[in-house]
């Protein structure tokens, strides 16, 4: 029996080694030198791609002057290795890919990938003070996906929920809740993927800079049951139909909030609830707090333009009468989609004597800003 066990163990090790060899062959083409990409060293970043067949390889990254169309040419070296070295951009998380003979491809040597809607892009981490909370903390919270019934929309839907470190070990403790909403093209996975929400909250809580809190990240597309990656067909929806105008916002307040209060140990009152959202989610944030004043005492619309309207003052006065603790607006000065609209909201709040903060950052309508905003306003919640 001992001899048989030894043989089986040896066979298992052999299979493991073969699998590792297969992965090695896949990553490095099974030929030529082992290469590293990206390589961050001494203030420089080097990108490499083994593509001997290619006639032209370019690098595209969102740190470039034009993040949408900007490219830099890579040079072909010995063994068909294409390479480029650039000055490291400022500390942040960036995305990039290669363009090989006109076709966009990901870096096969970099398994750090994030999804932006239907696009999958490689991630480049540049360490530093600004990005330190985007890395893993020592104490980790938990991220789970939950399904809930939505009678108003007519089907079950999925959300992502973050619970802080220690939630499971402290069965009597109750926690405040941040409802964190994504933008257009996103879904319930956007804030944990591109937004690094779990890492940011883990770090802030571990450092004592933020209160331990639950974070709820729903799917803000009322025609979707869940992210498209699950392969669940979206429902047909006429966006011009008035019944859909505030369908998601109503579901958020009337269905999601009660579900969370029932399923989790929450501080189930306005002082224990915050709502924040980027772009489309910022619109959901303003709509939810105008239509349902007194549900959330911490309000943070991000990169969200609001239009002038004759009724805007009356709508905002409902929030003032209900009371609130924090109204925090974040926008980038280069955000052509939301900057002017944020100034409109700022002016109306000022004219109505409603205390608030207008936080204006650099850059435009980008995740670089939204991670910064979460890292900033999360420190102000529930205090």
Question: Can you name each region flagged by the protein language model?
Answer:
Residues 21-28, 35-69, 75-383:
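Non-catalytic cap/lid and distal C-terminal segments of serine-dependent acyl enzymes
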Residues 2, 30-33:
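Short, intrinsically disordered low-complexity segments
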Residues 1-23:
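Bacterial Sec-dependent N-terminal signal peptides
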